[in-house]
Amino acid sequence: MKRRTAAQALIAAGLAPAAFAQGGPVEGRQYARLAQPLQGAAGRIEVVEFFFYMCPHCNVFDPLLEAWAHQLPADVSLRRVPVGVTLMHKLHQRMFYALEAMGALTPQVHAGIFNAFHRAGIEANDEAAIVALVSKLGVDPVKFKAAFNAFGVQAKLGQGAALAQAAGVDTVPALVVAGRWRTGPSMAGTPGQSEVAQGQQALAVADFLVKQARSGKTS
């Protein structure tokens, strides 16, 4: 909860860096246009975050993103897609999708997983450890195990990997806006900035791109 409150306070206080003073974000610098647009949510401007739980940069960015998501207008939606290549990453992807399928992936549980890995030093590198972790976060372990091993969850892994590849994601965290543009803290930020400042820059770029999508602009 403290992670969320601090991030919301930063945004509410207007402490995001005064970036793009010279006319706004620039394509090829702060964001990239996808070679092939991706299909998004019908009737909405969809922002997709690509991340993985063990990523320290994703851990810094997550509370900023969550606070930003709470302020989104009705025509904008946020979707998270966990990615990764190692066996542990894939286990964590299954954890995410199992919780999502159960309707148990609340902001508190999502933040609790990050905190467990990055603050408590928990290493959930097998199914038993993952079940123990989500149980501590208030999730029914029996229902979770059933969801964790369901075919639909396994299929989601392949879909997420295909989406990340189609979006050209090669680093995380990354944001894809309206299926047309990709940005992220490492791209939107500048050398020497803190990771929090870079994350705020990325969200400022996302806001810019949402406006572009809403106005019908494609570049």
Where do the PLM segments sit?
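Solvent-exposed loop/turn segments at secondary-structure junctions
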Residues: Y53-H57, G84-M88, A116-A120, G152-V153, ...
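Periplasmic c-type cytochrome electron-transfer domains
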Residues: G24-L34, I122-E127, V196-A206
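Polar helix-capping/helix-linker motif
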Residues: F20, D126, N149-A150
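Extracytoplasmic thiol/disulfide redox context detector
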Residues: K2-K90, D207-S219
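Sec/Tat-exported extracytoplasmic proteins
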Residues: M54, A69-L72, L99-G103, I113, ...
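C-terminal cap of thioredoxin/glutaredoxin-like
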Residues: K136-S219
